[in-house]
Structure formats: structure tokens, C-alpha cells
């Protein structure tokens, strides 16, 4: 049996009596007590997540932009100002999703990418293959000397500034999906990005691994609540954000995973997977579901892999949970394209088919319930 990998905050999690689980080969905290309270902290105040299992990869070289024009499905032409970030899928030639990731542009010869933990080795091998085959001449460097802390919630930015005063000047005017580099802090040189995976405002802070425990402890002293993977999952589901390996993988097109907005077909740019996407088009709708209540009670909880029965054929739930913000059972589902928002479908839960309403994603954004 392979030993679990540890982030630099592993001892800090254990000191907080976190319940630890195997998450894709990493020893990670699922909660530190009440998962519901952790969820609520992010929706109403500020919570923080150790996301150091995710991998920072730096790309340097004069043809970095040309490389990303070909390598990813979204258009790096949108990256014009230093620190601008772009969410995209990395596709295989069949149009399947190798990973979803964020690309940061700093200079024409320096781009930074953050990839998912479970796909990091696969992603880096693919990047190296594309770099070699295309003769781009880039240096591709995984940066395991970095850790990442995501601080999320309506008060997250103020609490980061209280903890790292030098970050205020560099990031107070930062728009969403932009990053700034903050040098010379007590926690080393930081990259602070106004991004996240919760549907709330906040920052994701890339910090030297040797300083991350000091930053974590300082944020806690400024009232930021440690949160685990359990709350991260309910928050991202409410926010309509996909989880790689569950809502899409290398056999699923982004067009069938609610990610058409991340694919740029508006220019003649050649990119990996484009021909397959244009040939196959959209083959399934990706929708939100809310389980209907009978006499004020839901008959179960929506979970991944449950069958969805519609008048147009069957579909499947990809992610499901009980929403603390809505007090409803919610899910994402891949269903036939004829299914429309407002329709009622039926979900197979054990031996029953229970009605669920089809809604537009997201369910919740910036603390407000959007899906009624």
C-alpha cells in the first residue's frame, strides 16, 4: 500500500483534531468538528482551506503564449494584463477533459498554472509531450516548494489584509480572476489571487511551503475558521462548480459538463480537442436538480450515480448533497438535451422514483440563494 502524501499543514490539521481522510492519495482534513458550521463560516464570515495538494506549475519561455493557445480550450488572448487569470479545460484529442485548471499570465515569457492534485502527474506529462512535439522550448517546472491556502467568505479579504498588511495595497483594487505578487511579507513572497471554489469572494494565497504554517496560524488568530473537504464540497456544489473526476473526466466533453462557457470556438485558433468538439457538439444537458418535498419532507438525499428518469430518456446524477444554505437536497445531473429548466424529472433513490425539479445553476452565489 502506497503511503499517503502530506501537505505542509498536515501537523497543523492534526493539532486541530481534524478528521483526516484519503483524498486521491493525500491525507486531508474532511472537517474539524461541525461541517455545517464550517460551511456557514464561509457563507457569512471567513473560512480557510488547505489546498496545498493542488500543484503549481510554472511555464517560462518566449513561446509560452503560443503554447497555451494550442494546449487549452479557452482563449489566452483574453490574458492581456499581468496577473489576469483564466479558467479552462485541458482536453485530449477526443475532446475529453484531462483536467480543469487556472492559468495565470504574468509576462509574455512567464505563465503559472494551478492543476488538480489527482491529475497533476498526468497533466505535467501531457504538457511536456505538447511542449516537445510542438518545439515550444518552454521550461515546465512543478513547484512543490509552494503551498496554497484558500481564504473564502464575505470578510475573507479584510481578514487577509489584517494578517498580511503588505497585501492590501497590492490587492485592494484587484478584480475577480486576477492575481498580484506581494513581495517581502513575513510569510515570504506571495501570489494572492481573487479566485476560489465556494461561490464567495476571497483570495487563494500561494505561499512558500516553509511559511505556510505561520500564515495558517496567523489567519486563525485573525478569526478565519479552518474548514475541511466536507464544507468545500457542499459550498462548491451550491456554487455550481464542477469537481474533476466526478462531474467530468477524460471521457466527457466540456460541452456535456456545463463548461461550454470555458471553450472558445469564436476564433479559428487550433487547439487540442477542437475537431472532436465541433464534430460531436453537445450531446447532453448539464443541469441542477432540487429534490421535491412531500408534506414538507424530502424522501432522501441526491447522490452521485443515481439514475434520472425523464420523458426524453435516462440521465445520471454526477454530484449530489444536502445544501446547508437551502435546506434542500441538490444535485448536478447529465440528462438528455431536451430536458428544460422548470421540468420535473424522477430520481431513482433505492426502490423509489422521487420527483426533482430542474433548475439553472448555480444554486447559491455570494450568500444568496438563486435557484428557487
Curated annotation (Swiss-Prot):
Show the GO cellular component annotation of the record: cytosol; glycine cleavage complex
Kindly report, in one word, the top-level EC class recorded for this enzyme. transferase
| Reactions accelerated catalytically | N(6)-[(R)-S(8)-aminomethyldihydrolipoyl]-L-lysyl-[protein] + (6S)-5,6,7,8-tetrahydrofolate = N(6)-[(R)-dihydrolipoyl]-L-lysyl-[protein] + (6R)-5,10-methylene-5,6,7,8-tetrahydrofolate + NH4(+)
Might you name a Gene Ontology BP term for this protein?
A: glycine decarboxylation via glycine cleavage system
For this UniProt entry, the molecular function terms from Gene Ontology, in alphabetical order, are:
aminomethyltransferase activity; transaminase activity
User: Which keywords fit this entry according to its UniProt record?
Assistant: Aminotransferase, Transferase
Q: What is its EC number?
A: 2.1.2.10
> How is the subunit organization of this protein annotated in UniProt?
The glycine cleavage system is composed of four proteins: P, T, L and H.
Per the similarity annotation, which family is this? Belongs to the GcvT family.
Q: What does this protein do?
A: The glycine cleavage system catalyzes the degradation of glycine.
Write down what this protein is called. Aminomethyltransferase
Q: Species name for this entry?
A: Burkholderia multivorans (strain ATCC 17616 / 249)
Q: Which gene encodes it?
A: gcvT
Amino acid at each position: 500500500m502506497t503511503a499517503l502524501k502530506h501537505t505542509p499543514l498536515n501537523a497543523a490539521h492534526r493539532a486541530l483534531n481534524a478528521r483526516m481522510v484519503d483524498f486521491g492519495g493525500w491525507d486531508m482534513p474532511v472537517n474539524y468538528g461541525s461541517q455545517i458550521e464550517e460551511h456557514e463560516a464561509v457563507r457569512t464570515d471567513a473560512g480557510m482551506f488547505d489546498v496545498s495538494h493542488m500543484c503549481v506549475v510554472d511555464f517560462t519561455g518566449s513561446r509560452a503564449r503560443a503554447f497555451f493557445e494550442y494546449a487549452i480550450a479557452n482563449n489566452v488572448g483574453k490574458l492581456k494584463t499581468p496577473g489576469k487569470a483564466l479558467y479552462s479545460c485541458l482536453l485530449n484529442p477526443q475532446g475529453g477533459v484531462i483536467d480543469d485548471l487556472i492559468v495565470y499570465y504574468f509576462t509574455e515569457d512567464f505563465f503559472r498554472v494551478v492543476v488538480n492534485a489527482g491529475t497533476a502527474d498526468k497533466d505535467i506529462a501531457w504538457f511536456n509531450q505538447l511542449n516537445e512535439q510542438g518545439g515550444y522550448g518552454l521550461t515546465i517546472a512543478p513547484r512543490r516548494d509552494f503551498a496554497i491556502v484558500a481564504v473564502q467568505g464575505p470578510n475573507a479579504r479584510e481578514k487577509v489584509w489584517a494578517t498580511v498588511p503588505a497585501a492590501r495595497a497590492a490587492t485592494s483594487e484587484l478584480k475577480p480572476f486576477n492575481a498580484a505578487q506581494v513581495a517581502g511579507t513575513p510569510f515570504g513572497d506571495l501570489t494572492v489571487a481573487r479566485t476560489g471554489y465556494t461561490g464567495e469572494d476571497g483570495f487563494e494565497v500561494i505561499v512558500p511551503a516553509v511559511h505556510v504554517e505561520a500564515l495558517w496560524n496567523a489567519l486563525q488568530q485573525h478569526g478565519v475558521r479552518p474548514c475541511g473537504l466536507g464544507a468545500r464540497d457542499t459550498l462548491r456544489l451550491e456554487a455550481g462548480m464542477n469537481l474533476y473526476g466526478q462531474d467530468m473526466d477524460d471521457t466527457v466533453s466540456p460541452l456535456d459538463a456545463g463548461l461550454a462557457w470555458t471553450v472558445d470556438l469564436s476564433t479559428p485558433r487550433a487547439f487540442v480537442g477542437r475537431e472532436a468538439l465541433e464534430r460531436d457538439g453537445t450531446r447532453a444537458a448539464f443541469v441542477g436538480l432540487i429534490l421535491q418535498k412531500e408534506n414538507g419532507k424530502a424522501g432522501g438525499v441526491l447522490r452521485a450515480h443515481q439514475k434520472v428518469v425523464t420523458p426524453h430518456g435516462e440521465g445520471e446524477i454526477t454530484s449530489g448533497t444536502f445544501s446547508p444554505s437551502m435546506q434542500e437536497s441538490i444535485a448536478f445531473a447529465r440528462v438528455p438535451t431536451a430536458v428544460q429548466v422548470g421540468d420535473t424529472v424522477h430520481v431513482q433513490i433505492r426502490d423509489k422514483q422521487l420527483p426533482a425539479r430542474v433548475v439553472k445553476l448555480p444554486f447559491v452565489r455570494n450568500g444568496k440563494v438563486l435557484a428557487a
